[in-house]
From Swiss-Prot:
Keyword field: Ribonucleoprotein, Ribosomal protein
PROSITE patterns membership: RIBOSOMAL_L17
Protein name per the record: Large ribosomal subunit protein bL17
GO MF annotation list: structural constituent of ribosome
Organism: Legionella pneumophila (strain Paris)
Amino acid sequence: MRHRNSGRSFSRTSSHRKAMFSNMCCSLIEHELIRTTLPKAKDLRRYIEPLITVSKSDSVASRRRAFNILRSKSAVGKLFTDLGPRFAKRPGGYIRIIKCGYRDGDNAPMAIVELMDRPVSSDDTEE
């Protein structure tokens, strides 16, 4: 029975899943826009939203908590210097998920995940 089991397994071990979402969070923080499958995009919200909420208060404990998930000094630095102040007034809903068709090959539903209020430049490309 599946009672009270939240989240998807994606046919991966728990350590693989943890590493995958850590890498996806780092990519989203670094590039502010990533392209992935729709189920992964929906589960990514569970990881990135609390990280951005933690980054609103810049303290050593907050940075350590974020580093424990991200494992990237550059991502933690950008999270606390750029994204924390940017979302200081926003009470939640830091990312936007946009459906973008189906992938060639296996017809998997794809989505673009982007940070809200991101600066738009003329040469933005999808990852």
